[in-house]
């Protein structure tokens, strides 16, 4: 009897050949009478990292809120995979595989590290043991801080704790707002290594970032949002110089 010939596993297709993980179509959004987004179109391939760049006040965080269901667009639509965001609540979107980590990190400062993790087990339907194993394997230093109040930790450690939500709930779509804000470059590099690893496991990641070099190091594609409009989109290397010009003029 002959041995079966092993079939080599194929590498994942490039981002341009994958179905959309996030589809934004003609989105307008406003705060009261002030329109902030003006007909934004954006496609993020499933399992890829997409960096959204641009100066402050350009609408980046607003777009994340629309995608995450925190702000309803005045016109246009958003789809996550094959699920329209529509009028779904943030909680319902979380159950369909969305995890959003806002600017400011989104941890519970008056709870310990371990208590924060326990709060997130309810969403992921995982045992506390599994949650701790996943978190401490990714961030060993959090194991040493597990009885410490989250609000008393450094900014980098708080961001690590925030990102552990993505490890706990295993979402299909992850939104990251200003991951590197206020952090040392060494910590930023460590966090983005994890982001790249999550994408390699099939997670679709959209990140808003001002730390351009760190974001473009892990991104498959990038776009520049200025005054509520996508001005340019393309490969990360091409976007680096364009992003610098946008910051200087924005």
Positions of PLM-derived features:
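The feature captures the beta-strand-to-loop junction immediately N-terminal to the Walker
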Residues: 53-55
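Helix-to-loop junction immediately C-terminal to a conserved catalytic motif
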Residues: 68
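Conserved ABC transporter NBD signature motif
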Residues: 76-84, 96, 128-130, 137, ...
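Conserved ABC ATPase signature
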Residues: 149-153, 157
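ABC ATPase C-loop
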Residues: 166-167
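Conserved catalytic motifs of ABC-family nucleotide-binding domains
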Residues: 170
């Amino acid at each position: 009897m002959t041995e079966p010939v092993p079939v080599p596993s194929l590498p994942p297709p490039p981002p341009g050949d994958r179905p959309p993980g996030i589809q934004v179509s003609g989105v307008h959004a406003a705060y009261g009478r002030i329109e902030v987004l003006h007909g934004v179109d954006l496609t993020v391939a499933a399992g890829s990292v997409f960096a959204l760049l641009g100066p402050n006040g350009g609408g980046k965080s607003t777009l994340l809120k629309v995608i995450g269901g925190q702000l309803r667009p005045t016109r246009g639509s958003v789809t996550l995979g094959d699920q329209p965001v529509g009028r779904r609540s943030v909680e319902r979107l979380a159950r369909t595989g969305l995890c959003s980590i806002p600017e400011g990190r989104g941890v519970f400062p008056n709870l310990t590290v371990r208590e924060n993790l326990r709060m997130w087990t309810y969403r992921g339907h995982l045992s506390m043991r599994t949650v701790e194993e996943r978190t401490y394997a990714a961030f060993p230093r959090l194991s040493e801080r597990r009885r410490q109040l989250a609000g008393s930790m450094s900014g980098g450690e708080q961001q690590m704790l925030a990102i552990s939500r993505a490890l706990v709930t295993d979402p299909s779509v992850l939104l990251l707002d200003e991951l590197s804000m206020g952090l040392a470059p060494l910590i930023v590099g460590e966090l983005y290594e994890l982001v790249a690893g999550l994408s390699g496991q099939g997670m679709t990641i959209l990140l808003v970032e001002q730390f351009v070099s760190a974001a473009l190091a892990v991104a498959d594609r990038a776009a520049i949002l200025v005054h509520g409009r996508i001005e340019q989109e393309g490969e990360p290397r091409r976007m680096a110089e364009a992003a610098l010009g946008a910051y200087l003029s924005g």
